[in-house]
Amino acid sequence: MVFLSWGRPSSEQQQQVINKTGTFNYDNKYRGVSSRSIAKLKEDSEIDKDGFLINHARVLVGSGRESYEKGKKALQNWKHFGMDWAFVDPATPVETGKKFCICVKEVLPWVMLPLQVVYVDESRKSRKGPAHFGYGSGTLQGHLLAGEEKFSIELDGNGEVWYEITSFSKPAHFLSFLGYPYVKLRQKHFARHSSEAVLKHVNAS
């Protein structure tokens, strides 16, 4: 089951997809695992043994509390999907259990990929100290891949603001099996464009 649209998917089309999807399409033991650090993910032999590939990107997008708050707001409003070839409905609330679609333009049709927010994580040690906001989403039945992806923004101890994407995934449909090298290239392409979108938002006046 693949969800396609010849035009830019409407909110109604996305809701129809969400209504048709069932549960997560990957093992329950991996639920929330994307919340771990990239080092711990790479140390987990089970992830590799079960065929998942890890993707990671971390980009400096600014400095100071104001930049961090802008970055946090960008993630809450899905600005990291602010591209002409990929988007999430910006009205989608970032809350645990919320189902949504990532809509991606592929050559001719758009593909609607269903996911569900698995967790939302926020921490702040003090009003002026380090802070972190992020959330992870898991793939649902009907997604071309199986796994999780985390987006996060961090204000570190040096006052620098970092945008980070961490995911582990594997093909969940014969189309993604056949075109997995292309899928991996698209993931890297997305990471670059997403980082540029967050950087643009953080540095906007």
UniProtKB/Swiss-Prot annotation:
This is UPF0548 protein At2g17695. InterPro entries: DUF1990. Signal peptide: none annotated. One of its GO terms (cellular component) is chloroplast. It comes from Arabidopsis thaliana (Mouse-ear cress). It holds the Pfam family DUF1990. Belongs to the UPF0548 family.
